[in-house]
UniProtKB/Swiss-Prot annotation:
Protein name: Arginine deiminase
Keyword Repeat among record annotations: no
EC number in record: 3.5.3.6
Lineage top rank: taxon: Bacteria
Amino acid sequence: MTQTHPIHVFSEIGKLKKVMLHRPGKEIENLMPDYLERLLFDDIPFLEDAQKEHDAFAQALRNEGVEVLYLENLAAESLTNQEIREQFIDEYIGEANVRGRATKKAIRELLLNIKDNKELIEKTMAGIQKSELPEIPSSEKGLTDLVESNYPFAIDPMPNLYFTRDPFATIGNGVSLNHMFSETRNRETLYGKYIFTHHPEYGGKVPMVYDREETTRIEGGDELVLSKDVLAVGISQRTDAASIEKLLVNIFKQNLGFKKVLAFEFANNRKFMHLDTVFTMVDYDKFTIHPEIEGDLRVYSVTYENQDLHIEEEKGDLAVLLAKNLGVEKVELIRCGGDNLVAAGREQWNDGSNTLTIAPGVVVVYNRNTITNAILESKGLKLIKINGSELVRGRGGPRCMSMPFEREDL
C-alpha cells in the first residue's frame, strides 16, 4: 500500500518499511578523555570498527526489506540553494555559541569554502578544531578567545548523532522536533529543522507536534507509539513533564488519531536516561523491561476532553494495564537479564532492553546480551543479532540508533 503521507508510524512493531540512520563519522574521532562528560560519552569508540558494526546493522535492515536513509544525506539534500545554505551555516555557528568575533568570521569562511553539501554537513557534525582555523592576531582576539585559549575546539563535535532516535520523533503522520536535555545534543535538532522545512520530499509536508524552540526538554527515546490509539512517553532524566503536556495538547489538537497517552515516571539518572533504555515493545503482547524500574514506576493515563488534558494515576499491575490499553487478552513483560540482578544490570547497561522491532516478533538486538537474548528466543521471538562492541560505548542500542519514517499498519 502506497502511503499518502511521507511519515507514517502508528506502532512500535508494524513492519518497518523506511528508517533513518546516521553512520558514525569524524565526530567520534573528536572525542577526548578530558571532555567526555561534556559530550555525554563514557568512553571513546574506535571509529573504524564502529562504522563496520553500523554498516552491518544497516545491511541487516536491508536484508529484511527496509529502505535505509541517512541523516547526513537528507540534511545535505535540504540545502537546496545558496540562500538556504548560508542560513544553515549562520544558524549552526550561532547555536554553537561561538563568542569571539574573529573566530566566528574564520569559521564562516571555512564552511562557505566547502562546496559539496554532504561534505559541509559532515564537517558541521564533526566539529571544528581551533588548529583548523587561521591564527587570529592577538590584537583581534576578544576576551572569550583569550579565556578559552586551552580548549581545543572552536565548535564542539556531535558524537551522539548516531543515536538518531532522539533529536526528533515520528508520531503517526507527524514529527516532534525536540528540545533536548543538553546543549551538546540540542544542536543536533538543527538538521531535523532543515529536513522538515526544506527537503524536497519532507519539507513543509509533515505536521509538527513539538518545536525545538520550546524551552522545556523532550527526547525521542522517551516517545513510543504503542498503537494507532495509544502513545507511551517517559518522564526521565532527559524529558520534562511540562514538555509532555505541550506535546500531548498538540497531538490531540492536530487529530493525528491518538486517543490516550501513558506517561511513565521512573528513576532520573543516566543509567535509565530514556524510557526506551528500560522498556520496548517486541510483539503484539510482549515487552522487554528492566526489572530495576518496576518497583518505583508510576504510570499516568492522559486523555484530552473539552480542550483540556485529563490525567489520572494508574494503579495495579503494569502488564494488566498494557493489555487493557492495547486490546489484547494478556501482556508478558520479559525482564532484561532474567531474574539475576547482576546480569540484569550488566545487560541493561549494554542496552539489552533497547530493541528495535522490525515486524511483530522480529527484533534487532546486540549479540552481547546473551542472557536476555536467550530469554527472548525462548518466548518465540526471532532475533537479528548484530555486533555492537564499539557502538554500545555511546550507551545506546538498535532502537536508539534508528528513526522509523514508515511502518505498515497493524
